Amino acid sequence: MEYSLAVKRHFAAPKRARELPAGSSGLVAGEAEDRSLHVWVRFQLQIVDETIAAAGFQAFGCPHTVAAASVVADWAEGRPIAEVRKLDVKTVCAELEIPVEKLGKLLRVEDALVACCRS
């Protein structure tokens, strides 16, 4: 499989691939997985005054999954939680030039973010 330059960049040096400090005020977490697709994603968000003050992620999966989680975490930081809740992973697919057949894996990225926003 050939990967876009953006996927290669995010996979080689993912942005915000980190665990946020335990006990931080406003810290929420959410995760999603699909063992049949070999994918697991976990986001942590620190929410201060309805805004994402910090975002971090952990991911297991193919380069597309890791790159998408990197883009989403980077995009979310600094945005209002209401805006983050409206993320459409298809936009991330287009930005990273990810083939539509990988959408099932990327939906787990969206599911993890939604779970985080519900916390």
Question: Model regions: which residues?
Answer:
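Domain-level signature for proteins that mediate thiol-based redox and metal-cofactor handling
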Residues: M1-S119
